[in-house]
């Protein structure tokens, strides 16, 4: 556990981790401060950050399990102590860490008698099992247990659809929420008009990321939400209204992508953000540090200028070129004229 003394400050706004500890493989704790803030700012930031931490951070979960020998979810299998429903619940609790964005396959294939734990999950190399000791089932007889799994990265809570499985495939309620809890508190100091505040932020995570990583991702997500307001021009939007409702133009990435391919003038490039390009985190962070937030910013930069950026490599440029060609059928200019 790490603790640091907190000193009241009138210097430039800054943050610090004042306490950090690991209670278990699946419970990390961090306590942070941000100061000095003017009266009211701490509450504004604290409420926004808590919402972003609990609702905007992405996580990776097992979302489906399949075993052909299982007739239905509430059945039992000879030689297995747990019911199928209990096994599905245990799979739901497995904590994973990854940066994948598509559904990936994993599996369990073991023979009893033995305990089955998370260590027995055969997963893709870019998926890490945080706690390999997590319990799944107990095979009490010499039988084979083979389960096919689906792994997905998302955010929030996704309830499984209410359907009757016909092929032994069962969806799992997924909790894509690496942050278990987040609280904020405020300490005020000073007098009268000189009054200032210190924001205290506490974060508990499930071990798939540290509290500091969660704080970084939540901050980045909040910043991205406000990026459109930083553009000088206001885009004209036509609203179709009637007495009870109005219809907005399509805002999903897939709709934007489809329209862009049909007509490059259909969707302004400044409204397609680099978050949606699914770039590696290091490449993404380099672009963000250089104030490249949208596809328009990226195309305006040029290949040679990208290579000159700090920590940017030729492999990163190739990754961007491939992404632009694949999704948008456009090239990144080598040199700006």
From Swiss-Prot:
Assigned keywords, A-Z: Chloroplast, DNA-directed RNA polymerase, Nucleotidyltransferase, Plastid, Transcription, Transferase
One cellular component (GO) term of this entry: chloroplast
Any one Pfam family match given in the protein's UniProt record, by short name: RNA_pol_A_bac
Catalytic activity entry: RNA(n) + a ribonucleoside 5'-triphosphate = RNA(n+1) + diphosphate
Biological processes per GO annotation: DNA-templated transcription
Protein family membership: Belongs to the RNA polymerase alpha chain family.
Protein name: DNA-directed RNA polymerase subunit alpha
Source taxonomy: Eukaryota, Viridiplantae, Streptophyta, Embryophyta, Tracheophyta
């Amino acid at each position: 556990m790490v603790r640091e003394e907190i000193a009241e400050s009138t210097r430039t706004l800054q943050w610090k981790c004042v306490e950090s500890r690991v209670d278990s493989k699946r419970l990390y704790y961090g306590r942070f401060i941000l100061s000095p803030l003017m009266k009211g700012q701490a509450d504004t930031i604290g409420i926004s950050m808590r919402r972003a931490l609990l609702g905007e951070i992405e996580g990776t979960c097992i979302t489906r399990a399949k075993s052909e020998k299982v007739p239905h979810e509430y059945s039992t299998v000879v030689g297995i102590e747990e019911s199928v429903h209990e096994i599905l619940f245990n799979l739901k609790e497995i904590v994973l860490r990854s940066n994948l964005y598509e559904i990936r396959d994993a599996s369990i294939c073991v023979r009893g008698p033995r305990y089955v734990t998370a260590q027995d999950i055969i997963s893709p190399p870019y998926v890490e099992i945080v706690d390999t000791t997590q319990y799944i089932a107990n095979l009490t007889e010499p039988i084979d247990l083979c389960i096919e799994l689906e792994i997905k990265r998302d955010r929030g809570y996704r309830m499984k659809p209410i359907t009757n499985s016909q092929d032994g495939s069962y969806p799992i309620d997924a909790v894509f929420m690496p942050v278990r809890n987040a609280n904020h508190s405020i300490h005020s100091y000073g007098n009268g008009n000189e009054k200032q505040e210190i924001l205290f932020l506490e974060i508990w995570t499930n071990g798939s990321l540290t509290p500091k990583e969660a704080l970084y991702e939540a901050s980045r997500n909040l910043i991205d939400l406000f990026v459109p307001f930083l553009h000088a021009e206001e885009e004209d939007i036509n609203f179709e209204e009637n007495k009870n409702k109005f219809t907005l133009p399509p805002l999903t990435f897939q709709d934007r992508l489809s329209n862009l391919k049909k007509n490059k003038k259909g969707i302004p490039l400044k409204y397609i953000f680099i978050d949606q390009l699914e770039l590696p985190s290091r490449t993404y962070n380099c672009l963000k540090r250089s104030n490249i937030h949208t596809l328009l910013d990226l195309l305006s930069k040029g290949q040679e200028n990208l290579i000159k950026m700090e920590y940017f490599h030729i492999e990163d440029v190739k990754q961007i070129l491939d992404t632009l060609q694949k999704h948008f059928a456009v090239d990144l200019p080598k040199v700006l004229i």
